[in-house]
């Protein structure tokens, strides 16, 4: 099991950028005070959007001016590589919040306001959505424990 860390907690009433907060309450529908602009994004499977700070740094190296929250993620994390974790992975936060990775995030047209090329360049590094399994308070800097999903062998493999 690997450990990650919360670098930034980001919210906005809708749209981007999202603004960093030192701590925030997390409910089943997502982060308190955070809004989603599109009805299709208001689902429990997309309650929280998570992005790796390392992916933002990669994109900065390609000429994009990005900081945590710029691409609309709620949580900017370090040492997780959420884009490569399987769906169903559990993230246990030190203060008790538990999330489950539920859906790969696809680039959206709102990224055009940053740069029209970003939507293409961020494919496969846009982060992941998660559903909330256990509500609580997130605090910037807290650690995250990763629990990979158990994969049982199929009948043909027994």
Show where each model-derived region lies:
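Electropositive, beta-rich accessory/interaction domains or terminal extensions
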Residues: 1-98, 103-105, 137, 148-158
């Amino acid at each position: 099991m690997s450990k990650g860390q919360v670098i930034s907690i980001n919210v906005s009433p809708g749209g981007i950028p999202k603004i960093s907060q030192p701590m925030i309450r997390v409910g089943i529908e997502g982060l308190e005070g955070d809004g989603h602009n599109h009805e299709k994004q208001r689902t429990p499977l997309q309650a929280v959007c998570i992005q790796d700070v390392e992916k933002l740094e990669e994109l900065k190296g390609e000429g994009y001016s990005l900081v945590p929250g710029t691409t609309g993620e709620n949580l900017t994390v370090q040492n997780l590589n959420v884009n490569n974790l399987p769906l169903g992975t559990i993230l246990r936060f030190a203060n008790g919040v538990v999330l489950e990775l539920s859906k790969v995030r696809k680039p959206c047209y709102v990224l055009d306001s940053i740069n029209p090329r970003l939507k293409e360049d961020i494919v496969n590094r846009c982060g992941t959505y998660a559903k909330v399994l256990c509500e609580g308070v997130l605090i910037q800097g807290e650690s995250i424990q990763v629990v990979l999903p158990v994969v049982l062998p199929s009948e043909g493999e027994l």
